[in-house]
């Protein structure tokens, strides 16, 4: 299959089951088996899905030199995915918390750290040159890649995940 270049958010996501919205105040809630953490983010989710479909993927993303960043690297390696494009240049790895109720309603709190102000470091162009498709997810550090991918005459795909 083809080599796909993916640039997008990587974060550690924690989901929390709640009884409903609005969440009534209490000093402590005990949602037994209702709190889960996983490596996620649009970039990871797209790369993981395409990897499972048999494509060679190279995810380019920003994480931090922290425990959450270690978790990201371990999860990608366990999935058999390349970590070559992961840059540990943020002060900390982005994280999110998602509250969800039994009806499926959810509220997402996302801490992007300095993702929106930090570009991908130099060195991604050889991978972009070799790819058959540049998948550039909706995060600021992907924007500058549009011009490079166009200059290299690459097919470009972008996501729209919130309307």
Predicted regions and their residues:
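Ribokinase/PfkB-type carbohydrate-kinase core domain
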Residues: 2-12, 75-88, 101-163
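Conserved beta-strand edge residues that scaffold enzyme active sites
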Residues: 64-65, 90-91, 163
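A glycine-rich beta-to-alpha transition motif near the start of alpha/beta enzyme domains, typified by
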Residues: 56-84
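Short beta-strand scaffold segments in enzyme catalytic cores
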Residues: 48, 95-99, 107
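Short, well-ordered alpha-helical microsegments
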Residues: 69, 94, 142-146
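Glycine-rich phosphate/adenosyl-contacting loop at the front of the ribokinase-like
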Residues: 1-60, 69, 154
């Amino acid at each position: 299959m083809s080599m796909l270049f993916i640039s997008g958010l990587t974060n550690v996501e924690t989901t929390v089951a709640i009884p409903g919205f609005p969440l009534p105040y209490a000093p402590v809630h005990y949602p037994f088996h209702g709190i889960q953490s996983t490596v996620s983010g649009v970039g990871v989710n797209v790369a993981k899905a395409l990897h499972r479909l048999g494509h060679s993927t190279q995810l380019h993303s920003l994480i931090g030199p922290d425990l959450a960043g270690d978790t990201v690297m371990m999860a990608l390696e366990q999935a058999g995915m390349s970590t070559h494009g992961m840059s540990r240049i943020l002060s900390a790895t982005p994280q999110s918390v998602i509250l969800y109720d039994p009806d499926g309603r959810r509220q997402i709190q996302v801490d992007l750290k300095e993702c929106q102000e930090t570009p991908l470091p130099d060195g991604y162009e050889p991978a972009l040159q070799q790819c058959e498709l540049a998948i550039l997810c909706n995060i600021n550090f992907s924007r500058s890649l549009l011009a490079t991918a166009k200059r290299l005459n690459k097919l470009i795909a972008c996501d729209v995940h919130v309307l």
